[in-house]
């Protein structure tokens, strides 16, 4: 079954034959579209007036709507007009002259007829788009950090520099990337300073151990002999 809310329908031949689209003939134009219900009250009135030329001339849009109010069942009515390029048509179920239940809404815009999407369809589309962008963001965030037992989670300096050089990156993101880059370099500098501080201590320990007689050397470190 065709999904009508994805259909765009138009008939330039019909409009040319009827010398344009107006409020008094837009429902007749709509009746040619696949959105029209052939068992609606509109069709019943059209069949009744089709061969009655005198009644057809008197049946203006206002009189047509008044006749629909006397009936019960499915009907199409014009709810908004902005000539010459916009009409809103509502499909509804009439229960009595004062009470109706809306079913769907249609737009006639510049000779094109559309069906308005439902609220559920709009929400589904928005949630799907949001989920897709969240998935992309999480995939990119997972690839940013790297882990090592000695340093924990770190960010590659090349990744930070590349991201910071992108002109399309927002200022807030650039500031965060700059902070991460400075923290990363500070951590590296701290580790290098720690290694340089303990290097003389290690050298002194090795010199002291080498001065003790009978102490063998194993890979640059002095191990005392067991007695």
UniProtKB/Swiss-Prot annotation:
Source species, domain of life: Eukaryota
Spans annotated as Disordered: 149-172, 204-227
InterPro entries: Mediator_Med6, Mediator_Med6_sf
Compositional bias (Polar residues): 149-162
Keywords, alphabetical: Activator, Nucleus, Transcription, Transcription regulation
Thylakoid listed as a keyword: no
GO molecular function, one term: transcription coactivator activity
One annotated Gene Ontology cellular component of this protein: mediator complex
GO biological process: regulation of transcription by RNA polymerase II
Lipoprotein is among the record's keywords: no
Subcellular location: Nucleus
Pfam families for the chain: Med6
Record-linked Gene3D superfamilies: Mediator complex, subunit Med6
Subunit structure: Component of the Mediator complex.
Family: Belongs to the Mediator complex subunit 6 family.
Role played: Component of the Mediator complex, a coactivator involved in the regulated transcription of nearly all RNA polymerase II-dependent genes. Mediator functions as a bridge to convey information from gene-specific regulatory proteins to the basal RNA polymerase II transcription machinery. Mediator is recruited to promoters by direct interactions with regulatory proteins and serves as a scaffold for the assembly of a functional preinitiation complex with RNA polymerase II and the general transcription factors.
PANTHER family: MED-6-RELATED
Protein name per its UniProtKB record: Mediator of RNA polymerase II transcription subunit 6
Organism in which the protein naturally occurs: Yarrowia lipolytica (strain CLIB 122 / E 150) (Yeast)
């Amino acid at each position: 079954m065709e999904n009508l809310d994805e259909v765009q329908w138009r008939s330039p031949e019909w409009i040319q034959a009827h010398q344009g689209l107006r409020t008094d003939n837009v429902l007749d134009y709509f009746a040619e579209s696949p959105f029209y219900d052939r068992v609606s009250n509109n069709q019943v009135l059209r069949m009744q007036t089709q061969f009655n030329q005198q009644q057809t001339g008197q049946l203006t849009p206002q009189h047509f709507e008044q006749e629909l109010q006397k009936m019960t069942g499915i009907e199409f009515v014009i709810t908004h007009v902005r000539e010459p390029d916009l009409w809103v048509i509502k499909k509804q179920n009439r229960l009595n002259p004062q009470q109706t239940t809306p079913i769907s809404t249609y737009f006639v815009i510049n000779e094109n007829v559309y069906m308005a999407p439902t609220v559920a369809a709009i929400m589904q589309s928005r949630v799907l788009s949001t989920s897709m962008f969240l998935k992309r963001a999480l995939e990119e965030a997972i690839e940013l950090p790297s882990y090592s037992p000695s340093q924990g989670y770190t960010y590659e300096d090349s990744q930070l520099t590349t991201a910071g050089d992108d002109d399309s990156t927002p200022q807030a993101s650039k500031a965060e990337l700059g902070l991460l880059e400075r923290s990363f370099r500070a951590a590296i500098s701290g580790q290098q300073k720690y290694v340089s501080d303990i290097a003389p201590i290690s050298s002194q320990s090795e010199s002291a151990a080498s001065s003790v007689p009978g102490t063998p050397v194993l890979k640059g470190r002095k191990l005392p002999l067991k007695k």
